[in-house]
Curated annotation (Swiss-Prot):
It is found in: Cytoplasm. Its EC number is 2.5.1.41. Belongs to the GGGP/HepGP synthase family. Group I subfamily. It catalyses: sn-glycerol 1-phosphate + (2E,6E,10E)-geranylgeranyl diphosphate = sn-3-O-(geranylgeranyl)glycerol 1-phosphate + diphosphate. Keywords: Cytoplasm, Lipid biosynthesis, Lipid metabolism, Magnesium, Metal-binding, Phospholipid biosynthesis, Phospholipid metabolism, Transferase. PANTHER family: HEPTAPRENYLGLYCERYL PHOSPHATE SYNTHASE, PTHR40029. GO terms for biological process: glycerophospholipid biosynthetic process. Mg(2+) binds at residues 14, 41. This is Geranylgeranylglyceryl phosphate synthase.
Amino acid sequence: MSDWADWDHIVKIDPDKTLVDGETFEDVAATGTDAIEVGGTTGMTEEKMKRVVDACGKHDIPVYIEPSNPASVVHSDRHDGYLVPVVMNAGDVTWITGAHKEWIRIDDEIDWSRTFTEAYIVMNPEASVASYTQANCDLDADDVAAYAEAAEHLLGQEIVYVEYSGMLGDPDIVAAAADILDDATLFYGGGIHDYESARTMAQHADTIVVGDLVHDEGVDAVRETVKGAKDATATVR
């Protein structure tokens, strides 16, 4: 069974951003989240990534790097592995296979036993990740479901990630992706800011990802989203 099969909640930490004053990575690990993912779209460097991975890796919680480019890859025993984005609706093929090829070409230390992919479906045209990947975000529920099905059954993806990055998404679109998947785990990220938004999205997605909230509002707010996700999962099960 994959590490993420039982995750309800992930905190994503952007190494290019700071935590709320007075809070630590230990505080983040203690929110009740199931895992920490470390990554961001812009401003990523090996030095920034290493600082956050080393700090988070001291605590008893799974830590995964989500590399946005080869420069942000850190080889360390302080993390559990890599979750590498493959952007299904990217207009620039760099973010489907190009960056991945380049990483493999220049890095002879990749541990394939700890390296996995996430099939991203980017939905917010205003988000940095949409601009960065030239993603076509003009998608309806049928489009998203088709991308999700292609990811699982054509490309063998174990994780499908519906990403609204910075805005709360349409639950019906997330539900369409959830309904079409057989075994792949559905991640959802974007705009989760309180108990209710977490509970709503966790009723459809297997795992919700909370990012900006930890940097903007802090661990108390994150803790509420953990509760929302756990309550939704308990109801669904």
